[in-house]
Curated annotation (Swiss-Prot):
The gene is besB. Involved in the biosynthesis of terminal alkyne-containing amino acids such as L-propargylglycine (Pra) and L-beta-ethynylserine, that are produced as antibiotics by S.cattleya. Catalyzes gamma-elimination of chloride from 4-chloro-allyl-L-glycine (also named L-2-amino-4-chloropent-4-enoate), followed by an isomerization, to form the terminal-alkyne product L-propargylglycine. Its EC number is 4.5.1.-. It catalyses: L-2-amino-4-chloropent-4-enoate = L-propargylglycine + chloride + H(+). This is L-2-amino-4-chloropent-4-enoate dechlorinase/desaturase. The lineage of its organism: Bacteria, Bacillati, Actinomycetota, Actinomycetes, Kitasatosporales.
Amino acid sequence: MSAGSPAEPRPVPGSVHSVSVSIPDVRSVIGFESGDPATLRRIAWGYPRFRTHPYVARVAALVAGAVGGRAQDLVLTRSVRAAEAAAAYAGLAPGAVFEASGVRGVRVAEDDPALAAVRGHVQHTGAHLTSREAEDVLLEAGLIEARQAEEAVSEEPAEAVRSALATAYGAGDPADVSLHNSGMNAVAAAVAAVTDLQRPAGRRRWIQLGWIFFDTMSLLDKRLFGTDHVTVPDPFDLAALSRVVAAHPGQLAGIIAELPSNPSLRCPDVPALREIADRAGCALVLDATIATPHNVDVLGYADVVCESLTKYATGSADVLMGAAVVGSASPWAAQLREGLRRFGDVPYHRDAARVAARIRDYGDRMKRVNAGAVALAGFLERQSAVRAVSWPYDAASQANYRKVERLSDAPGGLLMVDLRVPLERVYDRLAVAKGPSFGAEFTMASPQIFIAHFDLLSTPEGRAELRSRGLHRDMLRISVGVEDPELIAEVFRDAFDGAG
């Protein structure tokens, strides 16, 4: 396999801009998530929104003297807007925001409780300083000798990315596509834009459909935009959704859902969601990162569709960037276009240049990923150690997914495997990259419940809550790559042999 599992943790795919880290065994995963010092000394990398990139840490040290603080007191952001928003959320005075040496951020003492709020806001909204911008700051300061060489598009890369996405989504105009610092930056901007346009009418409440990505839930749980929300736990339960809508007349700003949901991979009935949103007078925001616009056609049903371009759009696992696409039929289309710009952060030009180089192969990449996922799902469903495989073609989701599918045999590349045996028996033996993120062109495996919900796994009450959502520790998320399907199956066969 092109990014097989090493014996020791390492960044994957190996670039200085890698967005994942391969963690070889469950014991190391537990040490990493629990903050064990010995484990963290071995694992100096992580997903950039969750763990400070080494280049960003060096930039913080560089500017600390100029702003009168220590590096550990600084949270660096993509923009002044992002810094001001994080500081305001944490209750800090405007003077906490700084700009020095071309870098922006928030200064807050390491022992100040507000620091956690600032960091959380920047993480959940994807508004961090990226590694390529940090690389350029270090180069300008003479602290590194050169940028890492990579394929990139130098001429109007943002326009190239918008054009590619407009074609993939079936958007009428590339202007309907806004580019963002990360996928979560796109989601956060969409939620903020909808909230802003609905607030004058007294609509301040969101509906969260199902158990979705941790950071998206955090936008609502932590009231980052001053909204209330109601969760409908089962994304298939349209009757429950309709009851919630009926219970809050004139109060709903929007419904947010994923296709499919992360990590459960459940597919809601998107046309039905549109009908319910219309009856409620609220917006529908969809995150279709996992399905991708090459596999599903959902823009006609949504007011905004969000996507993390870090995933399948690039496939290289070495750049964070996102997009939000406005449905031209939305009654709020013009307001949403403006709001997405106002509440989001444009990507750094070199990140856009990298995405532009990689997005050219998006469609072909998905054809190969789809073929591999269909083959691997069939293999896994025959394994005695597997209780079930959740994916868009399982019995619960298939009918809903078919309603928006562009072509047959196009499920996307994620599989969630419910194991009958302890996770260690399979995960520790797997010879693939193992860690956070998905959507790379090489196959990856993730102990996703440990990574996304370690706090819940750590208590009896938390474990009970996870089980109420159909989740538990012994689940393995697989992101299928573009390798030959027979080779992928062989690697997993080796791991499952002897697993029990």
